Amino acid sequence: MDISPLRGYYAAHTPTLMGERGGSAVLVPLVRQDGEYCLLYEIRSANVRQPGEVCFPGGKREAGETAIQCALRETWEELGIPESAVTVIGEMDFIHIRAGSLLRPVLGEVDPATLAAMRPAPEEVAGTFLLPLRELKAHPPEVYLYRQPVEAPDFPY
């Protein structure tokens, strides 16, 4: 057996997460409002998957796009907040979501003056709201463990 094709392939190969299908990014938007930091959430419109879901602005990464570029682009498309109004603090830990892709959150501070001019895209966003961080700190998350058997094709060896 000739393994030269393997040698050629792996000479230029960059390892990635096996099984990752695409990828997405969200902006975790911090806004200083009335002297305290808040998170800016959006409510998904009835026209998209998971209608009524509360989420951060974000979506699928385009080819060659970084998580930061994606998060900023999606924030502009969904909320009308320009890139220039967001100070990126950094990328947060990412998660492998059930859909089979990596979700990469980007923490950023949004200029509060931008909120008055914010124009959510009605086809994607039903509404927005601010939640003070103190509210989240006052209510620790409840964690529920859900186990479901996964049936996968068997490997015969």
Regions found by a protein language model. Give the residues of each.
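A short secondary-structure junction signal
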Residues: A116-A121, H139-V143
